Amino acid sequence: MGAIWRDGKDPMGLGQASGRGTLMTTLGIELLDAGEDWLRGRMPVDERTHQPFGLLHGGASVALAETLASWAGTCAVDADKVCVGQEINANHVRPVREGWVYGVATPEALGRTSQVWSIRITDEAGKLVCISRMTLAVVPARRD
């Protein structure tokens, strides 16, 4: 399979430029690198992403998963289209107290009107923390 990125879209550049002033920056999510069909990012496990018992909040993991899948999906469609979330699920399999978690989004299906992405989130030791799957709708980009 060749690179899935369309119309010269760069997932790294688009995500870094468009993420300012969003949940992405509030949670400290960073895009790290991209391959031909994957996007990788990380998020700190700290007071911004903890639940009351000092562990990584499951919702923060889902925010990381959705961020990665949405950016990757939008870069895998024509310039006049964007991707928006329709459904996301997550299984939280290991707690994390501090450090960083890393997510990698890879496509399961890239259709004309919808996409399905898998996102694996691991801790700094590479142990699985969360596995997520997201469905995106492919819609016309707003030009206003």
Residue ranges and their predicted role:
Residues 1-144:
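Terminal targeting signals and extreme-terminal segments of soluble enzymes
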